[in-house]
Amino acid sequence: MPVSRVKVKNRHLKKKTKKPLAFYKPATKFAGAVLIAGTLTTTHELLLQQTSPMVQAATNSSEVFIESIAASAKPVADANGLYPSVMIAQAILESNWGSSQLSRAPYYNLFGIQGTYQGKSVVFKTQEYLNGKWVTKDMPFRVYPSFNQSFQDNAYVLKTTNFGNGPYYAKAWRANAATYQDATAALTGRYATDPSYGASLNRIISQYNLTRFDGASSAGNTNSGGSTTTITNNNSGTNSSSTTYTVKSGDTLWGISQRYGISVAQIQSANNLKSTIIYIGQKLVLTGSASSTNSGGSNNSASTTPTTSVTPAKPTSQTTVKVKSGDTLWALSVKYKTSIAQLKSWNHLSSDTIYIGQNLIVSQSAAASNPSTGSGSTATNNSNSTSSNSNASIHKVVKGDTLWGLSQKSGSPIASIKAWNHLSSDTILIGQYLRIK
């Protein structure tokens, strides 16, 4: 029988106990940590049932898996000041290259995080090594809509876990770890008790050149972002402007578009972006126009600070219902004279599944607001363009923030905050910019 990665990984435990044949054992987790409602839950030793021996995929299949998860891992790691290479290696190691039952659809739990996610969980048998022996338990594990939410949850664990003496995983952050090897060393004995955990991660990172995903972001990156604008007068009373913006931690295309008064589509078009994923340190061209009283054919260079943004349509009224036994999206769409697609859009549903007790928006009307754009700038000719303030309020997420708390603070419904910021779940990240009004 082939020797699995996990057997090799936990070889130091062989003398203490025999591994039950009915289970598969990945990385040993920290025994005292627990992830419930966004904090770390108990996972000492996760054993997944298997029907056949698990063997590492061939190199080409490995690269396919790496690329498939890197698209989610890199932006999440960058936004949280973590090494993408380490996060990808963790996902590979914890899920055995995505072959564990928990990591596959429809569960997408790459890191074995316990608890519930948006009310969803799945029960698996786990084993914990307690008092010198293995104890088997049935425990609930989080079910995610996609790998992206799994990475976000893992980042939340690494950034917010605190047992009273400061952030528990702080030494694994890029700001405190000069190299990825320093980060993996900091995880060993904390994230996993296996003494070879860091070495296993380092081997994967080196073998598959995962440092290529660490990109422009560097340890201790203090880049606060910024923009430089070149304004060109076209003799018609309108200045066409091109702003170069440097992406910083927590930025999203939506947040940048709101601050600069242009659409996400405009940013994507100007920068040939095929998705909404952006990276720390990336340069983005933001194009727009500003009215001016200049009448000559002069070129002016200016540094500018954005002061306005577009105000999207605001919900003026909405009807919500609590799902009861027998309800379906189809029945609700018929009853409230709307479409299933519209219900899914309002409620950010990725499938047609709804749950008893779930609150759903079933009707919503909105009044469009006129966009206002402009920027205050200091140019070489000492002329200033006027600007107007939008009604939007942008908030930078700090430790302890929740959607519910921001909703209470701003007076805006949670559903509105999620709609304005294109959030598909209630998970928000430290450093993230959110429109809350």
Curated annotation (Swiss-Prot):
Presence of the UniProt keyword Zinc-finger in the record: no
Pfam families (UniProt xref): Glucosaminidase (PF01832), LysM (PF01476)
Biased composition (Low complexity): 290-317
EC number of this enzyme: 3.2.1.17
Ranges where the LysM domain occurs: 243-286, 319-362, 393-436
Family affiliation: Belongs to the glycosyl hydrolase 73 family.
Name of protein: Probable N-acetylmuramidase
